[in-house]
Amino acid sequence: MPNHLRTYLVDHAALTLAVLELAKRARNSNPGGELGGFLTGIIPTLEAERKTLKEMLRRIKGSDSPLKNFAAWGAEKAGRFKLNDSLFSYSDLSRVVELEALLAATEVKTAMWDALATLAMTRSDFRDLDLGGYLRKNKTMGEKLRAFHRTAAHRALRTEEP
């Protein structure tokens, strides 16, 4: 019989690894300033999310997948090769693309924490985990990412008036 919960947790643990790597890359490309501070601030939350997913796996007698983790890690690294009108340096468009990827991942993680928080209400082995806290943090994270994205997109995509 398939263990859908295990597969779900393994897949999302791999996703959180990719998101964590992307957040670190974006932070390193945007040191200082409000965006850099925000990205620095979300990294501990992303690390805690990953740790919680791994703990949930442990509780259901599952384990992390090195193959899926490697694939997620590799996908994030491969994403660095997207050309953004600047072959060897970071561009304003790079920032927009990174923020869009973080936004998309945050939307997925928001849905995940919602599903897991709902599940935890019916499972005694998960009740002590603050899954609703992660849900709230991801909603807030998404709102802030949208604001940073709006500013970055305006800067990168504006054109001179004719």
Predicted features and spans:
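Juxtamembrane/interfacial segments around transmembrane helices
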Residues: 92-95, 152-154
